[in-house]
């Protein structure tokens, strides 16, 4: 399965445009083929470009968050010619790469923090993926503690300002580098970066501000989804911290193999067996489709391996269930290994009419000649 675009850039799903740009510049500078000659660097650079191209476009990003790569299949990848070292930031970017976390960086935010996103893998039957519907799942996620309202403090008390960092959440330390001495900001070891200390912890959540809850959810499956399609359920991830919004739940879909049907894009593939007489004379037979039984016309003289098409009986397009692919049916012709005496006589008469000599190949050779053998 393809890597997640957010993972490729090393950013969270809530990253804003500026965060995406910084991450992209840093990685693109590192793996640009003019700079990095290591094996695999060029492919890595293409992967980074593709991820940034999608995530930097608000509409493409929304489609990707909803449907994964299936939702952005039409977004083209940029080539190397569009990107040069000159476009990737100046000395400040290089400085940040080597000295991230020093005073040139912004101060750590101590306000509301968005909750973590969660992942759930959901298995679907073949027809469920074709037609969509609703599925009920159960998840475990963190919810804001109702006793302390997320503060982590015992009711009637409040967190107090951390005396180590003065509520900033960071402490300073000096460091010497080849470029001189710098002051580095690091996370406060006392409060863990929150800027506050809880003296009387909430008994319900143990001072965490959230508790784990098991919850049932109904997931709407769009028609036409495929293996690896990702659905986003807004607000069903873990609870945020300090009044921050919850994360999202990402449901990854995995379609189970079907004993009768296969999928190729939006087309459905299957095979049928017919007798040699049906192939010679033609007929109409009933075949299985995802919609139920359907009538299929077998033209006279149908050859083994012929592919017949039932139009509009395939997989719906995601987001446009009215538009469907086709059902492609491959015909296998069965040649009997045993026939009755009467059948043999009739076939031998037919062979004489056609001027066929039944030599070494016998009757089987004659039947093979009828089907292009």
UniProtKB/Swiss-Prot annotation:
Localization of this protein: Cytoplasm
Comment text on domains: The J domain is necessary and sufficient to stimulate DnaK ATPase activity. Zinc center 1 plays an important role in the autonomous, DnaK-independent chaperone activity of DnaJ. Zinc center 2 is essential for interaction with DnaK and for DnaJ activity.
Family annotation (InterPro entries): DnaJ (IPR012724), DnaJ_C (IPR002939), DnaJ_domain (IPR001623), DnaJ_domain_CS (IPR018253), HSP40/DnaJ_pept-bd (IPR008971), HSP_DnaJ_Cys-rich_dom (IPR001305), HSP_DnaJ_Cys-rich_dom_sf (IPR036410), J_dom_sf (IPR036869)
Co-factor(s): Zn(2+)
Annotated zinc fingers (CR-type), start-end: 132-214
CXXCXGXG motif repeat ranges per the UniProt record: 145-152, 162-169, 188-195, 202-209
Subunit structure: Homodimer.
This protein's record includes keyword Amino-acid biosynthesis: no
GO biological process, one term: response to heat
GO molecular function, one term: zinc ion binding
Native organism: Thermosynechococcus vestitus (strain NIES-2133 / IAM M-273 / BP-1)
Residues annotated to bind Zn(2+) 2: 162, 165, 188, 191
Protein's recorded name: Chaperone protein DnaJ
